[in-house]
Amino acid sequence: AINKTINKRTNTHGAMRNCIEYVLRQDKTSELLTYVTGPYRHDEIDYDLVYRTFLEEKKMWNKDTGRMYAHNIISWHKDEQITPEQAFEFGKEFAEKWFSGFQTLVAVHKDKNHIHCHLVTNSVSYEDGRKLHNTKKDLECMKQLTNQMCRERGLTIAEKGKHFDGSEIEKGEVIAWNKDKYNLFRQQVRDSFVADCAMAVLKALENCISKEKFIEKM
């Protein structure tokens, strides 16, 4: 599994509301695959109710400014032997361990060819009002916890420089991007040199049937 922290704009009410609304979209998840850790007094998990619950906690501690939430995505390879229900339990356990003391919305998306679990965490603790902070060291510890939980369940641990099956990624090997990643990359870094290079490579890959043809197009 890969646990990625989404570092987008997280300091406005609108951004938090939009994130919660997206995570709970009915075409991506279901009621049985959603949960909120910590205090949540509603029977139904609805994006507006979750949003208002997070806001109430912030206002209770007079900490309704700055970073509003954290967003993590735990994803599994399409060939991983894991069910949506197992991914859901994984996400809940991770949230309760890593984000202990903070309300976290857990929702599994199963609309893609790979299962992934979204965690949206309130930035203010319901225990003592402290703000959520993640350092580089914290991110490494987060990775270690994810790997430990995978190991306990017999799931694959992602290793840098290796494919899902454990084989080495050869130097110079081209790894295809999916459409969503490409569009996100294009939107965020459209004007950068790196983006131009990536787009040129992706364009050249279209309809290529051999390495020689790819080199010719480049």
Show where each model-derived region lies.
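N-terminal nicking endonuclease/strand-transfer module with a His-rich metal-binding environment
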Residues: 1-217
